[in-house]
């Protein structure tokens, strides 16, 4: 954590900025800088008394090197703060310095290729970004008249997603699943596939994830040659709940600058949005708020909206977001999962049953949805093939119980054909990932939408099957020799 002198220098640098929005923030800050004393310490919550110039909600204050954000005003002179760094060494009566402004983070091309924390400070061992502009992490979402809706899809190269749950450019897509079904591997593959073909800027925001995953991702993106057009931000699971709660807003502030000021399209990948909700619940508990359903904070819907509503497209550019969402105990009626669902244009549901069968990615073809899967957007052929695939897999699900009780031989010829098609479709929708090459031993494959449609169409047209269904497992595009019989 940087010392107090460095913070003062950063504030002075902000005052010299040519950015009008930042100059206005600094002008307001000069009216609110004050000194206070620590009044009470309760875990990560610190009460501070100010005699004058009481800081505002979201303002950043410092007690030595300890950073805190003002979360509540208790009375005329007392504020309640959430610690953003360890409180070790903090004592009653210690002086507290108010900066007069929220957290300000560097934005612009200077942050590309860097790994940063919630304060915009480097955690990659390199010098601080040489940025001339900084912005507050607390920004209002664009007004309705500035928003635009795109009717184009973002091709991922992953068959199951592109076919059944296409991602909207400028939309929000959720990867839902319980523990151990492959959310992080899938989002890492999406980074590998989309960042290399994405013409704009990519941001990865790790909320409450393992430090090991951050290091691996940083190295892999360097090896893939996409790090120079990517910003990585982390609020790791070992950090204070306030950090995990705010790091998503830091990522959005940087993404908004690329979109609004530089006119670029942004790909924002978040792993994991549930950790944002979890951190909000911890902060709410520290502040003494009464919990709501299943122990979540009463402000769950408001806090999610404050994050999700900033992810949108404007006339200047688009922010396309792909978010991993942990589902506690595989319960999709959990309030956190239910609230996140309502903000998304596409939902990719990962099934534990499919994962247990070795069908990776474990995308549930019947539960995954997208508003983009309409003839007007993807075309009539894509729409018809996707519907036929879903119908075939749904019929197979209905036949599973009969097969388990009586055996496959007791089915009619038509039903046996449905089962053969469905099992081949299930295996064809599996795919070797570039991000999993090191532990799977399979060479990764990126498959175009056209190749995916052609492969599914050929399987759906088959009436007799001379090949083995295992031949369709963990391949990319369907080889030419696999023709209908």
Swiss-Prot record:
Pfam families per UniProt: ATP-synt_ab, ATP-synt_ab_N, ATP-synt_VA_C
Membrane topology label: Peripheral membrane protein
Record's keyword terms, sorted: ATP synthesis, ATP-binding, Cell inner membrane, Cell membrane, CF(1), Hydrogen ion transport, Ion transport, Membrane, Nucleotide-binding, Translocase, Transport
Cross-referenced InterPro entries: AAA+_ATPase, ATP-synt_VA_C, ATP_synth_F1_bsu, ATPase_a/bsu_AS, ATPase_alpha/beta_chains, ATPase_F1/V1/A1_a/bsu_N, ATPase_F1/V1/A1_a/bsu_N_sf, ATPase_F1/V1/A1_a/bsu_nucl-bd
Amino acid composition bias (Basic and acidic residues), ranges on this chain: 1-10
Polar residues biased stretches: 11-24
Residue segments, region Disordered: 1-27
Keyword Membrane: yes
Catalytic activity: ATP + H2O + 4 H(+)(in) = ADP + phosphate + 5 H(+)(out)
Gene Ontology molecular function: ATP binding; ATP hydrolysis activity; proton-transporting ATP synthase activity, rotational mechanism
UniProt EC number: 7.1.2.2
GO cellular component: plasma membrane; proton-transporting ATP synthase complex
Subcellular compartments: Cell inner membrane
Binding residues for ATP: 177-184
Disulfide cross-links: none
Keyword Magnesium: no
Protein's job: Produces ATP from ADP in the presence of a proton gradient across the membrane. The catalytic sites are hosted primarily by the beta subunits.
Self-association state and partner proteins as the record states: F-type ATPases have 2 components, CF(1) - the catalytic core - and CF(0) - the membrane proton channel. CF(1) has five subunits: alpha(3), beta(3), gamma(1), delta(1), epsilon(1). CF(0) has three main subunits: a(1), b(2) and c(9-12). The alpha and beta chains form an alternating ring which encloses part of the gamma chain. CF(1) is attached to CF(0) by a central stalk formed by the gamma and epsilon chains, while a peripheral stalk is formed by the delta and b chains.
UniProt similarity note: Belongs to the ATPase alpha/beta chains family.
Stated name of the protein: ATP synthase subunit beta 2
